[in-house]
Amino acid sequence: SIFFRIVFFLVCMLYFIHGLNGSPREWNVFTEYFTERGFDCEAINLKNGLDLKRVHFKDYVEKVSGLVSNDDILIGHSMGGLIVQKVAEETIVKAGVCICPAAPNDIPMKTVPWWRQIRYLPFMLFGIPFKPSFGLVKDVFLSGWDEEKQRKIYNRLQRQSSHVTYEVMKQKISVDEKKISCPLYFIGRKEDVTIPLKIVKRIAQKYHSNFDAVS
């Protein structure tokens, strides 16, 4: 497994950070795998204890920063990968692993078509947490998958802060790579249509980091 590339670190904890509409349960297979091999693991519930009507991306960054020490490794997917980048900028950790990460504002990503964004304007304007429709998720984020699998994934998704959704999807988050002192490692998925390999590669290049692609 490519994850053995990080095993040479002597760590106190492996912290796993979920994506935008995800939850800690998406990491169950990973935490079980690494726990069986002697690692202490925690899948962070970003939303726990926070008011989704008020929370912003920086609140998630502060939450993760408050949990980790400089001996720990952060592993994040999608938005969680962007949180890894931001935490590494603001504090000291052993290393970070970013899986199909959302990009900071200097690396343009594919956006949701404007006409599919209109229905979510009231949520954005009034700070109402929401979960995108199955149609949007199916067509934009899970295209190419069979519908049974699309439904299974969609049913696991959770509501997210409209503020955080706006900040991530509209790429309002900046990261100063010169402030990052730990190694970062990036993983992209060959078939990913939301965050294509070329985007993951550009993010890795921003930090002069290693990059791998998986099927």
Language model segments and positions:
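Short, surface-exposed "cap/lid" segments of acyl-processing enzymes
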Residues: L14-G49
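Active-site glycine-rich loops that stabilize anionic/oxyanionic intermediates
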Residues: G19-S23, S78, K190
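Active-site loop/oxyanion-hole signature of alpha/beta-hydrolase fold enzymes
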Residues: K47-D72
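Gly/Ala-rich beta-loop-alpha elbow adjacent to hydrolase catalytic centers
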Residues: I75-G80, V84
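Flexible "cap/lid" loop of the alpha/beta hydrolase fold
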Residues: I92-G127, V164-K172
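Short beta-strand/loop motif that positions the catalytic acidic residue
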Residues: I180, F186-G188
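Conserved alpha/beta-hydrolase "acid-adjacent" motif
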Residues: V193-I199
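Catalytic histidine neighborhood in serine/cysteine hydrolases
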Residues: K201-S215
